[in-house]
């Protein structure tokens, strides 16, 4: 390698640090940044290599994303899985919480006699169950069904659930929604749930009857529908955070800017969301309504943490996590207030490769 006189070789001689990032294929701050290359640009001239879990099909990487055992991982995904994985190995730390409000459809076959939510009494409802120790899809659907039934005074004892067997949640491009549709069309289940833009697309393609559509605005404005909110957490590998707090703070600062960017460039944001979910722009627009920038926001306000506590209590009641699990030791939301100061490059990254 030829180096000109006076050139700073400190970064050139440093080995690159691999940092994994992961997000759900819906509206997330990380998705908005990833599609614009903003995360990579933040560290363009530094020995940090950001790699998406989504583009990697190695089983150990996919499993490590799910249980947060993957070193150097920063993850924005469903909160239930994050809580479960923290209870499993205490490997992660919570940086921020996000809320996604999107359309939730109650659907039945076109020939079904179900015309309204009250008609669900005595019916069989589709409920997914992924393989493995923890099923995020089951948590989401069960909370949603309980919430929906409660709006019309029904309980779980008034209906029956039909289990939809699905792949392990770490499987790339798993397709639970299509399996639910198959169960509804075949008569194994009388009704099912479809979520977000992909749900709108699939319901239309399958010719399903929409019994009820809960819009994002209605969900956000009605506390009784809080079980329909997609609660997300931004978490980070704890050893990586301890060794590289300034790096994590910079990543977090980028992620918390996504909502402002979405507000300034709504058309571009909508296009990115459609790309993330592999859906049409019109379906993404209908699914999220006017709440895209609100849904992209991340923070640690009291109301966000209260909603996270409600979810944790729900999981404890169903023995999905240990009763001793506590949010307080998990939190590192103080990183939201850290602003990395410019320092000598050697000092700044001398601990960068501490984490294996």
Predicted regions and their residues:
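Short glycine-centered helix-capping/turn motifs at secondary-structure transition points
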Residues: 31-32, 36-37, 187, 206, ...
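Short, surface-exposed acidic
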Residues: 45-53, 154-161, 245, 276-289, ...
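Conserved C-terminal helix/tail region of periplasmic/extracytoplasmic solute-binding proteins
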Residues: 315-356
């Amino acid at each position: 390698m030829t180096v000109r006189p006076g050139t700073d070789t400190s970064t050139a001689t440093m080995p690159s640090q691999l940092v994994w990032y992961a997000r759900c294929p819906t509206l997330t701050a990380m998705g908005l940044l990833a599609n614009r290359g903003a995360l990579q640009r933040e560290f363009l001239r530094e020995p940090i290599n950001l790699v998406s879990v989504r583009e990697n099909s190695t089983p150990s990487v996919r499993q490590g994303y799910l249980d947060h055992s993957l070193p150097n991982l920063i993850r924005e995904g469903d909160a239930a899985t994050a809580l479960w994985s923290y209870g499993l190995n205490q490997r992660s730390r919570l940086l921020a919480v996000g809320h996604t409000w999107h359309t939730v459809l109650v659907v039945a076959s076109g020939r079904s006699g179900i015309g309204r939510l009250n008609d669900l009494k005595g019916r069989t409802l589709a409920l997914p169950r992924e393989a493995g120790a923890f099923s995020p899809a089951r948590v989401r659907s069960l909370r949603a069904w309980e919430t929906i039934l409660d709006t019309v005074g029904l309980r779980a004892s008034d209906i029956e659930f039909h289990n939809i067997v699905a792949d392990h949640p770490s499987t790339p491009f798993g397709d639970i929604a299509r399996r639910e549709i198959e169960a509804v069309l075949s008569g194994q289940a009388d009704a099912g749930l479809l979520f977000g833009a992909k749900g709108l697309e699939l319901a239309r393609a399958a010719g399903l009857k929409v019994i009820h559509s809960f819009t994002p605005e209605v969900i956000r404005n009605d506390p009784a529908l809080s079980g329909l909110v997609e609660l997300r957490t931004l978490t980070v590998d704890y050893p990586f955070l301890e060794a590289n707090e300034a790096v994590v703070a910079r990543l977090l600062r980028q992620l918390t800017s996504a909502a402002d960017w979405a507000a300034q460039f709504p058309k571009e944001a909508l296009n990115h969301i459609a790309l993330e979910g592999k859906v049409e722009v019109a379906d993404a627009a209908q699914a999220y309504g006017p709440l895209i920038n609100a849904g992209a926001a991340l923070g640690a306000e009291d109301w966000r943490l209260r909603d996270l506590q409600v979810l944790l209590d729900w999981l404890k009641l169903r023995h999905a996590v240990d009763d001793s699990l506590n949010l307080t030791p998990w939190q590192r939301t103080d990183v939201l207030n850290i602003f990395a100061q410019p320092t000598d490059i050697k000092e700044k990254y001398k601990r960068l490769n501490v984490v294996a």
